[in-house]
């Protein structure tokens, strides 16, 4: 009877994220960039549009230290801040 209860159930199959992993910054390599970004958000009533420069710098730090995949900054929404070239090469 116990096999009849489990007959129709499906097991959960986890799947990886679409863009790969996003490792935590355990060593604090980008901590100063993160704190600068968070301070900007706090000072600007959490209006993230006012802190795009800080956000860009934080993501650049993460990409340089292999804490996230390299992506062109234009693809991340910073095309207007890149002066015609992306520092993050594919």
UniProtKB/Swiss-Prot annotation:
Motif (Cx9C motif 1): 30-40
Motif interval(s): Cx9C motif 2: 51-61
Pfam families recorded: CHCH
Disordered as annotated region, ranges: 1-20
Disulfide bonds: 30-61, 40-51
Location of the CHCH domain: 27-69
Residue list for modification N-acetylserine: 2
SUPFAM superfamilies noted in UniProt: Cysteine alpha-hairpin motif (SSF47072)
Composition bias, Polar residues: 1-12
Classification via InterPro entries: CHCH, COX19, Cys_alpha_HP_mot_SF
Tissue spec. comment: Ubiquitously expressed. Highly expressed in skeletal muscle.
Subcellular location: Cytoplasm, Cytosol; Mitochondrion intermembrane space; Mitochondrion
Any one of the GO BP annotations: mitochondrial cytochrome c oxidase assembly
GO cellular component, one term: mitochondrion
Keyword entries, A-Z: Acetylation, Cytoplasm, Disulfide bond, Mitochondrion
Signal sequence, start to end: none
Subunit structure: Interacts with CHCHD4/MIA40 forming transient intermolecular disulfide bridges.
Function: Required for the transduction of an SCO1-dependent redox signal from the mitochondrion to ATP7A to regulate cellular copper homeostasis. May be required for the assembly of mitochondrial cytochrome c oxidase.
Family the entry assigns: Belongs to the COX19 family.
Protein name: Cytochrome c oxidase assembly protein COX19
Source organism (scientific name): Homo sapiens
